[in-house]
Swiss-Prot record:
It comes from the Viruses. It is a single-pass type I membrane protein. This is Envelope glycoprotein H. Glycans are attached at N62, N212, N365, N412, N448, N465, N544, N569, N603, N683. Residues 26-702 are virion surface. GO terms for cellular component: host cell endosome membrane; host cell plasma membrane; membrane; viral envelope; virion membrane. It is found in: Virion membrane; Host cell membrane; Host endosome membrane. Residues 191-253 are annotated as: Interaction with gL.
Length: 737
């Protein structure tokens, strides 16, 4: 049984806040001091008479007994007191209290209240400092190694020590008194609705205002330790709570009608599942985040949710689970008596800072105000050194996660992060575009690789390093291909809601032609109509995504734009008609009424055009002889634009090295004979490659010369034998005659 002490109804809460930090809030706390508001000379006087400076409160428990309370008058002259009293509504009469009870949603009245008993275990790898007899101190007060596993001190990395102080519940009509303390703010934009959130060391809260027809309504969600907040009269935590546990409560604060409507989309059964399985396990919280997103995507795919039926409540399941995980990761008090597994920290902390990017795909924008974290930066640098990622040769998921967290904590992409990200992106692209198996590969054979592609996209978009940005976006546009679309479609059917399974390199690439119709044209072996609905939804929510990162203007996606390719410092617009000022190259082998144009623009500045444009000279090439002993030169990086006569634009292939060209030459079965290619070189040359064996290789290396001599000798010897045989046969026929 869960037992809570209920305060007396007539108790007046007096909240005194002492702080040395600057607090950003509606009330200016600079006037709050720790000394008494009574004059010092009055207190030190021999004959103290406090009566003129006191206010007396007398409460009768019966006719003969009463309790008397004296409070200094100066308390009521305080600006802070006036501010708090404005939120208390103490002058309202009983009828107003009654109306509020009927107006606001209460779980106990509506029959939705439940007490939750946690059944699952917290599987977070902790190590008790007092029970570990022999540990290796890797870094004093920060890292230890026990039985081959590294552990960390959660403090100060997993704390809000670097965050600004702020005020929560500052609106005059809130049912909770203002709370002052350290907090991390986040925002989510969904159409015309802006959702505000605060993560503190004691709770997390979310508030948004939306429209029900023409009437606006406000709803606040609260999860955490309700003992750390004070509700306004006549409410207490028990009145507003829908779920209560030993340490944390879940409250919904809103009027009856809007909350009932919200609960049609926001399923309390999913929250119950999370809480019963143990929400104190952060990894468990994120499993529920991904499962909620998986269910949301499933509804988009089957048509239950479309663009016209979108509303904020459809994302509240995943948003609340994410907020709970964030709060648990940073809550107070930290596990000061326990060390925490570093591998677990890296994974959960990466999820915490990457999930907002996932929300960006299905809402219009999500922002978390993360401060600069000096202690955390120092800690991550230690881990990068300990795990041997400083020389950029060890490219794996953990290394990328560490460099990503370094970017998050310091707020900018430094050269070391850019170098690691650049190499990692090249490695991923080569792995799946030019695979060693010599078979068509897709990204979803490893969900970590899919997640890493999304992490790299985030680093690139947030970087001021244009070389890195162009490199990542170009390669991810290339990875938005038929194999990866089919792989993603199947991964969403496997009922395996992992983070990587939810993502596609198409989501924030520079490819804009993937309508449901185009996907049907590209993939004819099976119907991907449900996948087309998903791509259309993300395209709608992330309109012109990544475009303004490479262009100084915005091109309309529905006006013939197919893709954008950034080759070295050149930008090419691939479209079904000329749409920007520049040098325009037209593909040759397209059907009637089907066109493909490539426009090279200057200085990333695009000016929209309608009809008049400058033709570029496209050189037709049947074979292209390359020397493997030489550098790539103007051919690296370069882009092959693939298209077909009846389908039009298929995709792009990025060439980063001479090995990529050699791979294409040796694995022509991976490149359909029905396709044609425009080759965009970085020296402003555009070639049209014709035929199926357009790359021929030569070499001047000694080994190759010896090999060629042997081959030529064999050819000469074979010809000699054929001629000899022919001559012998003719001679025999002559003799017979």
């Amino acid at each position: 049984m869960l037992i809570r002490r209920r305060a007396l109804w007539l108790t007046i809460p007096i909240l005194i806040i002492m702080t040395s930090h600057k607090i950003m809030c509606a009330f200016d706390l600079s006037h709050v001091h720790s000394e008494s508001c009574l004059k010092i000379q009055d207190i030190s006087s021999d004959t103290i008479n406090f009566t003129p400076n006191l206010v007396m409160f007398r409460f009768f428990s019966n006719e003969t007994h009463s309790d008397v309370f004296h409070l200094p008058k100066c308390i009521f002259d305080s600006k802070l007191t006036s501010y708090l009293f404005d939120h208390l509504n103490i002058y309202e009469d009983v009828s107003v209290y009654k109306n509020n009870f009927e107006k606001y949603y209460m779980g106990s009245v509506e029959g939705t209240y439940r007490t939750i008993i946690i059944k699952g275990e917290d599987t977070t790898p902790y190590l008790d400092k007092t029970t570990a007899p022999t540990v290796e101190i890797t870094e004093k007060d920060l890292i230890i190694t026990y039985q081959g596993i590294r552990y960390m001190n959660p403090f100060p990395v997993l704390s809000l020590i670097d965050d600004e102080s702020c005020e929560v519940f500052d609106d005059i009509n809130e049912l909770i008194l203002p709370y002052f303390g350290k907090c991390r703010k986040f925002y989510l934009n969904f159409g015309s609705v802006t959702l505000f959130g605060h993560i503190t060391s004691n709770f997390v809260t979310i508030k948004y205002t939306a429209q029900n027809g023409t009437d606006p309504y406000t709803i606040r969600l609260f999860f955490g330790n309700s003992a750390e907040i004070v509700h306004t009269l006549p409410f207490e935590a028990q009145d507003l709570a829908l779920r209560m546990m030993m340490y944390d409560d879940f409250e919904i604060i809103g009027e009856v009608g809007p909350v009932k409507e919200m609960l049609k989309s926001f399923k309390l059964s999913l929250l119950d599942s999370l809480l019963e399985q143990n929400h104190e396990d952060v990894m468990n919280d994120f499993r529920h985040v991904f499962e909620a997103f998986y269910n949301h995507i499933k509804k988009i795919r089957d048509g239950s949710i479309d663009i016209k039926s979108l509303h904020i409540e459809q994302l509240l399941d995943s948003l609340l689970a994410y907020s709970i995980g964030y709060y648990i990761q940073y809550r107070y008090p930290p596990y000061t008596g326990k060390w925490r597994g570093i591998e677990h920290f890296i994974e959960t902390e990466t999820y915490i800072h990457m999930v907002p990017e996932l929300f960006d795909l299905f809402a219009h924008n999500m922002t978390v105000k993360t401060p600069t974290r000096p202690n955390a930066i120092k800690f991550i640098n230690i881990l990068i050194r300990l795990y041997s990622y400083t020389d950029y040769t060890k490219l794996d998921h953990r290394g990328l996660s560490l460099y990503f967290l370094k970017y998050i904590y310091q707020g900018n992409v430094t050269d070391d992060i850019a170098t690691y990200a650049h190499r990692y992106m090249t490695n991923l692209y080569t792995k799946y575009t030019y695979p060693k198996t010599q078979e068509g590969e897709h990204l979803y054979k490893s969900y970590n690789d899919s997640l890493d592609t999304f992490i790299l996209n985030t680093i690139g978009l947030k970087s001021k390093n244009k070389t890195l940005l162009h490199h990542i976006l170009l390669l991810q546009t290339g990875m938005c291909n038929i194999q990866n679309m089919i792989g993603h479609f199947h991964s969403l059917q496997n009922n395996d809601p992992k983070f990587g399974a939810l993502l596609s390199p198409c989501y924030r690439s520079l490819r804009y032609d993937l309508t449901a119709k185009k996907i049907g044209q590209l993939i004819t072996k099976e119907s991907l109509e449900p996948y087309g609905r998903l791509v259309n939804m993300v395209r709608f929510m992330t309109k012109n995504s990544s475009m303004l990162n490479v262009l100084k203007c915005e091109l309309p996606e529905d006006d013939g734009l197919l893709a954008i390719a950034t080759v070295d410092n050149k930008t090419y617009i691939i479209s079904s008609r000329p749409i920007a000022v520049g040098v325009v190259y037209k593909a040759t082998y397209t059907a009637i009424n089907l066109f493909l144009y490539v426009t090279r623009i200057q200085n990333n500045t695009c000016i929209h055009i309608d009809k008049v444009y400058r033709d570029g000279d496209v050189k037709a090439v049947y074979t292209f002889s390359l020397d493997t002993a030489k550098d790539c030169g103007d051919m690296c990086p370069s882009v092959l634009v693939e298209y077909q006569t009846n389908t039009g634009f298929i995709g792009i292939h990025v060439i980063n090295s001479i090995a990529d060209i050699q791979y294409i030459s040796e694995n022509r079965k991976l490149f359909p004979e029905s396709s044609h290619y425009l080759w965009l070189l970085k020296n402003d040359t555009v070639l049209e490659l014709e035929g199926t064996n357009f790359f021929l290789f030569s070499s001047k290396s000694p080994g190759a010369i010896v090999l060629y001599i042997i081959i030529i000798s064999l050819i000469v010897w074979t010809l000699y034998e054929i001629i000899k045989l022919f001559c012998y046969k003719r001679q025999w026929q002559y003799q017979k005659l």
